[in-house]
Amino acid sequence: MHEMSITQSVVEICEKSAGGRRVLAVTLEIGDLSGVVPDAIEFCFEACTRDTLLEGARLVIERVPGRGECTSCGKEFPVRGYFDPCPACGAYGMRVVSGEELRVKELEVE
């Protein structure tokens, strides 16, 4: 489960950013195409925050839907995977516009 190491990295990033202050809430953006399972992050969060500045912090996860832009016709459309065809022209080449995000969006500290 790579979500455990991802959650540990999130905790480290938040602790550095908090500057020694207790963290009350963390907001993460997780894209639907990122390969990260939000439920698994939630499951790991309590264990990873034990005895840290984040212990007891609230975790908020904002999902970012996948969107692509067709490289043939330029149409932007929702995607669930990297090989979805363009709904306008049927071509398979696309550029991902959103959905690969995995970032700490907001940190609430004391």
From Swiss-Prot:
PANTHER family: HYDROGENASE MATURATION FACTOR HYPA (PTHR34535:SF3). Keywords: Metal-binding, Nickel, Zinc. Involved in the maturation of [NiFe] hydrogenases. Required for nickel insertion into the metal center of the hydrogenase. GO terms for molecular function: nickel cation binding; zinc ion binding. The gene is hypA. The lineage of its organism: Bacteria, Pseudomonadati, Thermodesulfobacteriota, Desulfuromonadia, Geobacterales. Pfam families: HypA (PF01155). Zn(2+) binds at residues 70, 73, 86, 89. InterPro entries: Hydgase_Ni_incorp_HypA/HybF_CS, HypA/HybF. Belongs to the HypA/HybF family. Ni(2+) binds at residue 2. This is Hydrogenase maturation factor HypA. It comes from the Bacteria. GO terms for biological process: protein maturation; protein modification process.
